[in-house]
Amino acid sequence: MILSVRLSRMMNRLRNLITDVPGLTVGNAHDAKVGTGVTTVLFDEPTVASGAVLGGAPANRDFSCLEPDAAVPGIDAVVLSGGSGFGLDAASGVQAFLREQQRGFAVGRTRVPIVPQAIVFDLLNNGDKEWGRYPPYRELGYAAASACSEEFDLGTLGGGYGATTFDLKGGLGSASAVTSSGYVVGSLVIVNAIGSAVIGSGPHFWAAPFEEGEEFGGLGMPQRVTPAMRSIGWKGGPQLSTTIALVATDAALTKAQAKRLAIAAHTGIAKALRLALALYDGDTVIAAATGRQALRNEAVDLIELAAVASDCLARAIARGVYEATALPYDPAHPAWKDKFAPIR
């Protein structure tokens, strides 16, 4: 009874954002002319994290630090960025911000901020990519780190600014939940999928069975899913895409346990997108544990954390598409609300 009352109070306080997990903040910055942006997550203190890359076309930075056998015990920030390989400059801007705060892994008399990063390919969204000698991502990374807060918007901003799916505008999504044992789980995602978040050509989200309330429209599933609606719609070639995410919890995990959480969270991508983990996607999930609560029943807690993280990521993906607005280019992918909102 005491636990159920506590859970009820916790759920009532949720923002439905990853920042419901204590110990982290989120900031966003974008360049509307270029059609790209950066999302940064700052941790209050060095945080246990690991990651899993299951897509066929990834690009990332400092992922070796996330392996369970790596010496670095914790990370200072995570960057989710547009820009493909050019976007990997964003972590340098975040490192510069953290260095000013005297944050980072201590090595002798100096500190090196540990900032793993994943990127999405948004170079073909009709934004102006003629940026001159150097791309804008280092400054965008610094700006996103400077803007970190517990409150942030979803949709067309940050690393999701230039994101698209097969048929709709993609974007930045987030969601949160509480396990039955009282651990907070949150997800943050850039939805730039090679496939689709909706069923067929209609408004219903593949993630509908996991929706909480009406967080992405409340339409549920269609009355019938026909073979035509199950057909594979995708961008149609090696136009590298990618869905990248961070899942976080306030549970205390080891790096090995965090890696298993990242692997399990990938099933949330498969729940919410058709296609997922494809050859031309670089689907990547980082899992972080801020360690505010010790595990009380390790086997049970880890299983439930994995299940809730998966569902949470599926919901965040749908929210990223649902909240997106179309880019100001011609042509541009339509936003879900522009295409489907009148039916509600």
Predicted regions and their residues:
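A structural signal for small-residue-enriched, beta-sheet-centric alpha/beta enzyme cores
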Residues: 3-7, 11-85, 89-92, 99-344
